[in-house]
Amino acid sequence: DLVIYWGANPAVSHPRHMERYSLEPRGQFVPEGRAGRKLVVFDIQETPTTALADDFVRIRPSSDFEVLWALRALVLGVPLRAKEVGGVSVEKLTALAEQMTTCRSGVLFFGRGLSLGRNGHAGVEALLRLTRDLNAYTRFYARRMRIYGDVAGADSVLGWQTGYPFSVNMARGYPRYNPGEY
């Protein structure tokens, strides 16, 4: 019942995604479709997707890691001393952490806005750790918004054969995982 897009603009890049997969489908646990879901969008600027959001959280450019780590701290019960993180007030982050821990089920879809930055691999790791932490409270999932020329098959085989989800280097004859390097 909670859908979060982070650094993604699916209204433009994946036009049918919300209609088919995330926001509008009616199902066993959310029979009312869109009316039963809340959409939160984290981005550095307004986009067509932020216009559809119930809650648009504007963050400073290149502050994804800090905001995700602050959310993670709040989910784990660690109080923040700062008044704002990445351009977002701690009060707003606290409310979002509460919303994430009390939803019945949530999903974090992340896009190139998170993964392509200077430290994109650290932002992705922070998002995945936040997702893991949220699973102590509720069902929470993280999914990457695929790029053009979908690499889902290659990712699936890499995960199956090596145990690593992406950024695998086989040059030495065995799998090495380091998303900041490869």
Predicted features along the sequence, with ranges:
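Short, structured patches in soluble enzyme cores that scaffold and shape functional sites
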Residues: 7, 43, 110-112, 146
